């Protein structure tokens, strides 16, 4: 039998392996009895989780949902697997400058670890308990590239569609958006395709936007990226400060990227941000987008 002749397993082997246990632990710890599950869409995961929470609340299935994501894949199998795919930067002599989205010398992403959670709440419920409201979720979008297992569509078709879907859901015009926290992983193909998609969706207004990739500072947080970058977008609204895309060097320009776009290179910029849009894209062609807007009392 397996008990007599097979390998010995820790009784926590299965619970520690399945991703839904993270959501389960939060439910157990705080006594939450509402919808409880985990989403999985690679690097779009926690944005999809936020979208799910938003949809459940507006469907009347819950008043409050804790939603987010975490990832800790800096281990031999995680780094080795991404390295075998040639997805990681090889700038090993200067790792702190290796994540350089939208620069010509970018050569792959840097892995990070982290997590983030947001408390999403039905507006009247939040007001009734005098909650501190940082921003409102205005709309969400989802799409699929239907192109390749790991590479984004070279023309950014999925990225374009997901932003249009989110704008439609929010009942907003492109001209209302002030800041885009881009997926921007510092990969040769992905950054070009996302920049193309932004120009197609926003037209001339693309040149009035602030655009930045906080992955230049955090590394790629994989399944946690959407949650952490949503928080960065919300704080840009709250504080009127757009975080930068660091590590860009003078003249390090890619001929396939339009530098008339304001990528907020190297230094945070003050501006009023009433609406912020956050993109996350994942292996498998998963695209997710969430739009936040300033809360007007």
Give the ranges of each region predicted by the language model.
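Condensing-enzyme catalytic core mediating Claisen C-C bond formation in acyl metabolism
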Residues: 93-170, 179, 297
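Short, well-ordered amphipathic alpha-helical segments that serve as non-catalytic structural scaffolds
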Residues: 22, 49, 121-122, 155-171, ...
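Glycine-rich phosphate/pyrophosphate-binding beta-alpha loops
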Residues: 42, 185-187, 217-223, 280-287
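Conserved catalytic cysteine-centered active-site region
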Residues: 1-52, 61, 85-110, 196-227
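Conserved beta-strand-centric core segments of catalytic alpha/beta enzyme folds
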Residues: 25-29, 45-125, 225-297
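Short glycine/threonine-rich loop-to-helix capping motif typified by GTGT followed
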Residues: 147-159, 185-202, 221-228, 261-262
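Beta-strand segments within the central parallel beta-sheet cores of soluble alpha/beta enzyme folds
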Residues: 36-41, 62-70, 132-140, 175-182, ...
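Residue-level signal for alpha-helix termini/capping positions
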Residues: 31, 58-59, 127-128, 168-171, ...
């Amino acid at each position: 039998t397996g008990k007599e002749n097979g390998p010995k397993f820790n009784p926590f082997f299965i619970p520690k392996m399945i991703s839904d246990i993270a959501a389960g632990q939060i439910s157990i710890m705080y006594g939450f009895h509402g919808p409880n599950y985990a989403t999985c869409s690679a690097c779009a995961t926690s944005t999809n989780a936020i979208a799910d929470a938003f949809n459940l609340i507006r469907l009347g299935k819950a008043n409050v949902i804790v939603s987010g994501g975490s990832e800790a894949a800096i281990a031999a199998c995680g780094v080795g697997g991404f390295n075998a795919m040639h997805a990681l930067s090889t700038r090993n002599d200067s790792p702190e400058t290796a994540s350089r989205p939208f620069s010509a010398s970018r050569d792959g992403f840097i892995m990070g670890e982290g997590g983030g959670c947001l408390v999403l709440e039905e507006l009247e419920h939040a007001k009734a308990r005098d909650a501190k409201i940082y921003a409102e979720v205005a709309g969400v979008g989802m799409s699929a590239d239907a192109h390749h297992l790991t590479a984004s569509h070279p023309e950014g078709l999925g990225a374009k569609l997901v932003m249009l879907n989110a704008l439609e859901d929010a009942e907003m015009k492109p001209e209302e958006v002030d800041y885009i926290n881009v997926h921007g992983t510092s990969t040769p193909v992905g950054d070009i395709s996302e920049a193309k998609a932004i120009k197609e969706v926003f037209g001339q207004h693309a040149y009035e936007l602030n655009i930045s990739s906080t992955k230049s500072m955090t590394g790629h947080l994989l399944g946690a990226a959407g949650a952490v970058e949503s928080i960065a977008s919300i704080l840009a609204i709250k504080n009127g400060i757009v975080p930068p895309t660091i590590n860009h060097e003078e003249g390090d320009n890619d001929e396939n990227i339009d530098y008339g776009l304001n990528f907020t290179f190297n230094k945070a910029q003050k501006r009023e941000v009433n609406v912020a849009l956050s993109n996350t894209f994942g292996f498998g062609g998963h695209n997710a987008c969430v739009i936040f807007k300033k809360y007007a009392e």
